[in-house]
């Protein structure tokens, strides 16, 4: 099973110590009552991986680890087999001892787009909400973060994260907890909070923005990345049963409307820092994620539209500050 004891010890004497009033009981209840039916298989794959200490570690330009002496073919095949047990891999990519995990999303492209607009992450305590496999947590560490904490209730992502951590030498500068943001108390303890690809899945987007604000210190920075539509501050798309074949998409505002939402929730210095269509090069089917991907969700007669006739995915990133 996953041992969160190191994380508890790390936060016991810092600004996150208040979290320990509820967190150990929450995670004990999760391990007792809420494990996914395949969790033991996934966790077994993690446990069977060797604990490696990389001779070469690059988290600044990617998530890349290498040994001083290349792994034998048998070692590489064994590690890759365990990693493939944890498919599908959606967020990455990872380069681990000669094994290329070519994930569905080129999450490194998103990082390249947003990083120039962020306040320096060096020395910061960071929360990444809906962090997936934790790819961006490692990039935050590479940018100098003191501590990067990710939360995501999807248990496969937790096992993917722990697998990567084990191959990175057990690095304790990043942690992933199997929680949703609604399970966090108002900690007001993070210097930077990220929410990327989450807002449109929330039934109440303003509540989500307040939850993000409640995690920030005064003066802290929010990076919000989400789907938007073209339009003025009065426009939002409320899809029907599906959007790009996703069932759980509730609100897709225009960028102008989302700026108003952020301001209404009490954020200041709100600015749009990036907006671009999602391409089939950035999100696609790979050998590590073999089911349908973006190309299958667009109208083959007009790729500017989804199969349902809505505008194709357009993603925008915003930076805002808590007063």
UniProtKB/Swiss-Prot annotation:
Catalytic activity from the UniProt record: carboxy-S-adenosyl-L-methionine + 5-hydroxyuridine(34) in tRNA = 5-carboxymethoxyuridine(34) in tRNA + S-adenosyl-L-homocysteine + H(+)
EC number: 2.5.1.-
Gene Ontology molecular function terms on file: methyltransferase activity; transferase activity, transferring alkyl or aryl (other than methyl) groups
GO BP: tRNA wobble uridine modification
Positions bound to carboxy-S-adenosyl-L-methionine: 91, 105, 110, 130, 181-182, 196, 200, 315
Enzyme class: transferase
Keywords assigned: Transferase, tRNA processing
Signal peptide: none
Record-linked Pfam families: Methyltransf_9
Cross-referenced HAMAP family: tRNA_carboxymethyltr_CmoB
Known function: Catalyzes carboxymethyl transfer from carboxy-S-adenosyl-L-methionine (Cx-SAM) to 5-hydroxyuridine (ho5U) to form 5-carboxymethoxyuridine (cmo5U) at position 34 in tRNAs.
Family according to the record: Belongs to the class I-like SAM-binding methyltransferase superfamily. CmoB family.
Subunit structure: Homotetramer.
Name of the protein: tRNA U34 carboxymethyltransferase
Source organism per UniProt: Edwardsiella ictaluri (strain 93-146)
Native organism taxonomy: Bacteria, Pseudomonadati, Pseudomonadota, Gammaproteobacteria, Enterobacterales
Gene name of the encoded protein: cmoB
């Amino acid at each position: 099973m996953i041992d969160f004891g190191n994380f508890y010890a790390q936060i016991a004497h810092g600004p996150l110590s208040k979290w320990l009033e509820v967190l150990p009981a929450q995670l004990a209840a999760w391990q007792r009552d809420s494990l996914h039916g395949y969790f033991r298989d996934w966790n077994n794959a993690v446990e069977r991986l060797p604990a490696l200490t990389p001779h070469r570690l690059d988290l600044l330009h990617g998530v890349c680890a290498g040994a001083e002496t290349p792994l034998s073919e048998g070692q590489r095949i064994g590690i890759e087999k365990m990693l493939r047990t944890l498919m599908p891999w959606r967020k990455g990519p990872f380069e681990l001892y000669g094994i290329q995990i070519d994930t569905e999303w080129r999450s490194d492209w998103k990082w390249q787009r947003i990083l120039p607009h962020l306040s320096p992450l060096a020395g910061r305590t960071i929360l990444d909400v809906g962090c997936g496999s934790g790819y961006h947590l490692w990039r935050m560490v590479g940018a100098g973060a003191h501590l990067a904490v990710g939360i995501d209730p999807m248990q496969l992502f937790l096992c993917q994260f722990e697998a990567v951590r084990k191959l990175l030498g057990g690095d304790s500068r990043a942690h992933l907890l199997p929680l949703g943001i609604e399970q966090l108390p108002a900690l007001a303890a993070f210097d930077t909070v990220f929410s990327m690809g989450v807002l449109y899945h929330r039934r109440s987007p303003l509540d989500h923005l307040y939850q993000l604000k409640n995690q920030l210190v005064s003066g802290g920075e929010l990076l919000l990345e989400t789907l938007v539509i073209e339009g003025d501050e009065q426009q939002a798309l409320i899809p029907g049963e599906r959007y790009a074949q996703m069932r759980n998409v509730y609100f897709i505002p225009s960028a102008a409307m989302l700026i108003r939402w952020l301001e209404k929730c009490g954020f200041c210095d709100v600015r749009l820092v990036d907006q671009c269509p999602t391409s089939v090069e950035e999100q696609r089917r790979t050998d590590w994620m073999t089911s349908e991907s973006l190309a299958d969700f667009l109208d083959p007669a007009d790729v500017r539209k989804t199969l349902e006739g809505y505008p194709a995915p357009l993603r925008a990133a915003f930076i805002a500050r808590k007063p």
